[in-house]
Amino acid sequence: KVLNKPRLGHLRKAGVPPLRLLREFRCPVEGLEVGAELRVEQVFEPGQVVKVSGTSIGKGFQGTIKRHGFQRGPETHGSRNIRKPGSIGAAADPSRVFKGLRMAGRTGGRRVTQRGLRVVNVIPEDNLLLVRGSVPGPRGSYVEVRRER
């Protein structure tokens, strides 16, 4: 992707090459120079509790059973209501469907934060952070790791 001139100037001033992802954080380390590389061992240590944010895996258009955990209807005795959501509201009195009613739709592919994950190990040679638990997003995606307060 081509960066615009203000962003290129911002990176040039910091002495950093154009990168795929540019994020801004509060500096967790004192006395860090502009454009300096922040290593994982400077910020995290084993046993620390962190929260990890990222874009969850998109699952496309899903029904209410998969998306919201609705129960399905009976499969036998002539029922044709196996995977349908059921009633979506009252009749003539409200004369409408209330906002926010859980229905079928696009599932996943949104920002999710997994909280309370424990740092198992920090590998300084590879700049790796090992965390116990699930991390949002597909393999190879970018995540944001922050200290839990």
For every predicted segment, state its role.
Residues 1-149:
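Extended basic (Lys/Arg/His-rich) segments that typically form rRNA-contacting surfaces
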